[in-house]
């Protein structure tokens, strides 16, 4: 009995590579924000939004959740890692939920910014959570814009030939 065919292995491999690339992108460009008790500005969202544009919502949820989890684990924010798994996983899923890109963007922004606002408020107080709102809003907007630019360029290279968006 064949457990996995070549198509599934190729898809799993591609998702693992994209998760690693998203993690590395986020880890290399991580900037702690003073006075915001745990907020960081990172380019992780570029990988999440690029994943949703290239692969689909389920794949982006997996990539976003695991890459964010690994980022927090290795960057000294382990108190956030399980929250990040859920928040960025939800962000990736909602970014591809409907056929309306503006609605998807708004939903994904709300889950990411709102999720970290609640977690930050419970961990460090609501004043700190309010102070960190702008960081997450900027991170989402920059991630979305860069992904909109990068996704067509990546598609044109042909490296994703044979992979169908779900």
UniProtKB/Swiss-Prot annotation:
It is found in: Cell membrane. It is a multi-pass membrane protein. Keywords: Cell membrane, Membrane, Transmembrane, Transmembrane helix, Transport. One of its GO terms (cellular component) is plasma membrane. The chain crosses the membrane at residues 14-34, 35-55, 62-82, 105-125, 126-146. The keyword Transmembrane applies. Gene3D superfamilies: 1.10.1760.20. The keyword Thylakoid does not apply. It holds the Pfam family ECF-ribofla_trS. It comes from the Bacteria. Its main location: membrane. Probably a thiamine precursor-binding protein that interacts with the energy-coupling factor (ECF) ABC-transporter complex. Unlike classic ABC transporters this ECF transporter provides the energy necessary to transport a number of different substrates. The substrates themselves are bound by transmembrane, not extracytoplasmic soluble proteins. In E.coli forms a stable energy-coupling factor (ECF) transporter complex composed of 2 membrane-embedded substrate-binding protein (S component), 2 ATP-binding proteins (A and A' components) and 2 transmembrane proteins (T component), probably with a stoichiometry of 2:1:1:2. May be able to interact with more than 1 S component at a time. This is Thiamine precursor transporter HmpT.
């Amino acid at each position: 009995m064949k457990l996995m065919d070549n198509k599934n292995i190729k898809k799993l491999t591609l998702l693992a590579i994209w998760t690693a690339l998203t993690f590395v992108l986020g880890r290399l460009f991580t900037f702690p924000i003073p006075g915001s008790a745990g907020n960081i500005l990172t380019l992780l969202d570029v990988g999440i939004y690029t994943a949703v544009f290239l692969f689909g919502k389920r794949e982006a949820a997996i990539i976003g959740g695991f890459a964010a989890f690994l980022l927090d684990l290795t960057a000294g924010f382990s108190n956030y890692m399980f929250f990040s798994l859920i928040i960025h996983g939800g962000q990736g899923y909602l970014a591809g939920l409907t056929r309306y890109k503006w609605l998807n963007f708004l939903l994904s922004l709300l889950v990411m910014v709102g999720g970290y606002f609640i977690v930050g408020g419970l961990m460090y107080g609501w004043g700190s959570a309010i102070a960190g709102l702008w960081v997450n809003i900027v991170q989402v907007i920059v991630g979305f814009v860069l992904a909109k630019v990068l996704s067509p360029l990546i598609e044109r290279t042909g490296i994703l030939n044979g992979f169908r968006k779900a």
